[in-house]
Amino acid sequence: MAKEPMLQFVKMARETPEKRPRSLRSQDFHEICGRICPQDRLCEGNCVIEQSGHGTVTIGAVEKYITDTAWENGWVVPGKPAYERSESVGIIGAGPGGLAAADALRRAGLQVTVYDRYDRAGGLLTYGIPGFKLEKDVVARRVEQLEQAGVQFVLNCNVGEDLSFDAIRGQHDAVLIATGVYKQRDLAAPGVGSAGVVQALSYLTASNRRSFGDEVDDDGLDASGKRVVVIGGGDTAMDCVRTAIRQGATSVKCLYRRDRANMPGSQREVANAEEEGVEFVWLSAPRGFIAGDAVEGVIVQKMRLGEPDATGRQMPEIIEGADYVEPADLAIMALGFEPEDLPTLWGVPDLTVTRWGTIKADFRTHATSLPGVYAVGDIVRGASLVVWAIRDGRDAAQSILDYLAQPAVVAAE
């Protein structure tokens, strides 16, 4: 995945703090990966000790402990370069991919400016992932360290509206697109526009803003005292159900159209949610919503698993005549994310995209169809994991350095 030094972590955990090596690559953002990576389906899921029946090495907890110790002792320092270079890079998106690239490029001496639509850097690390999984001061201290290293942040900047893509390109020698995917999938169902039927990201963003002390226009985005139904089976759905429990919902149910074994989210997160009081309703999907002034219930259609699709995954089929109404005061749709139409939004028709709308980039160099423009993370892969975005950002930074070292680019400067 992100080339995590797992054996090194285990060895360091055995040492006293005074003997631990302080050369651990801080640009790998271990303090973040140790908290939010789904280790149960990555490194821990492939642990040979687990496969032998002795229980996995909990590398996520070890990684978190080691890096927290390093931060507490001041061993993680800003990555200031040995010498400054005149070339500059503009990065669009202050999420994990953009931050990882900014760190690597700044360490190499380049002048780095990060543009982001939000008022705080971090992207989904700040506004999407709940604070009980990723404490916001952990993200803030990483951003602060990048600022101390000389990375410039331009916030509240929506590219295509506040600043054109061409303007950014004209100001920098290279550009990295790391916007993530923010277009939320919707349902084409009766009652979907009713008050109390909300999108997952809107709900999670409101919750995170409250934790910062921001004034939030409620607009039904608080689960306190409500019967909550979350629709979806991915990691975002798990974040929603666990947030609703913490907000004091009277009941929280999660509808998923397949069974437990076929859900895309982390099984560890499902177990955590169940322990906290969430009820999972498998083989169930919404047909529509009942609403007066606001949502009152979800019309649930029961499903069964049918024949496999082209990927080998069994397709859900509707069981006719088995519909029922699940009472709800708040229905949260966590159906996944799709890429925005960046060529249209940014006025760059020559930026090539795939048939899924993601940016088409070379899988080795991350170069796009535009010279000197690179892309990483979810805007290339589709909705994926933070650890992949971090690795992409580091790898793209090296490609940008290679590009700027080319004779033609040097001559042009």
Curated annotation (Swiss-Prot):
Record-level GO BP terms: L-glutamate biosynthetic process
Catalytic activity field: 2 L-glutamate + NADP(+) = L-glutamine + 2-oxoglutarate + NADPH + H(+)
Pathway terms, separated by semicolons: Amino-acid biosynthesis; L-glutamate biosynthesis via GLT pathway; L-glutamate from 2-oxoglutarate and L-glutamine (NADP(+) route): step 1/1; Energy metabolism; nitrogen metabolism
Pfam families the UniProt entry points to: Fer4_20, Pyr_redox_2
Binding site for [4Fe-4S] cluster: 33, 37, 43, 47
UniProt remark on cofactor binding: Binds 1 [4Fe-4S] cluster.
Needed co-factor(s): [4Fe-4S] cluster
Highest taxon listed in the record's lineage: Bacteria
GO molecular function: glutamate synthase (NADPH) activity; iron-sulfur cluster binding; metal ion binding
EC number: 1.4.1.13
UniProt KW keywords: Amino-acid biosynthesis, Glutamate biosynthesis, Iron, Iron-sulfur, Metal-binding, NADP, Oxidoreductase
Ranges that cross the membrane: none
Disulphide linkage map: none
Subunit structure as annotated in this protein's UniProt entry: Aggregate of 4 catalytic active heterodimers, consisting of a large and a small subunit.
Additional observations: Glutamine binds to the large subunit and transfers the amido group to 2-oxo-glutamate that apparently binds to the small subunit.
Name of the protein: Putative glutamate synthase [NADPH] small chain
Species name: Cereibacter sphaeroides
Gene designation per UniProt: gltD
